[in-house]
């Protein structure tokens, strides 16, 4: 019988080399997903932070429904956690930026799709022109960056 504190799998064995970035290497994580829709926003913000800690110049791109990840939230007031985990995505994005990562969010999605203003964003998020979404991706492709695309439908 297993009990609290037992390991069910081997966490000690690592199969692959622990890669670190070479100077100047870049990474981009894109999000076209609604905040809290499944676990993708949680998992890939953690992955983006891990890339940053491995030395990659890492950016996050929020576009389409992904901009909802960057909105300030809370209840009953902004910043108040209504229940444990309620602000996890916000906290992860803030931590990512604290550690030097950049977060970009599409202005078109913000206004046209969600009726929000740039003031709705977590401080530090950089609003961008909708034409910059593709150029951000192309810039990273040209730099041979690691790119993680996150989509939900």
Language model features with spans:
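Short, glycine-rich nucleotide/cofactor-binding loops
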Residues: 23, 27-42
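Glycine-rich, aromatic-bearing surface loops/beta-hairpins
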Residues: 137, 142-153
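Histidine-anchored nucleotide/phosphate-binding helix
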Residues: 40-60
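A glycine-rich helix N-cap at a beta->alpha junction
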Residues: 78-112
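Positively charged, low-complexity intrinsically disordered leader regions
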Residues: 2-23
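Short internal beta-strands
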Residues: 57-64, 103-107
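N-terminal beta-loop-helix "entrance" segment that forms/cooperates
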Residues: 66-79
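A short aromatic-anchored loop/beta-hairpin motif
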Residues: 96-99, 104, 113-114, 120-141
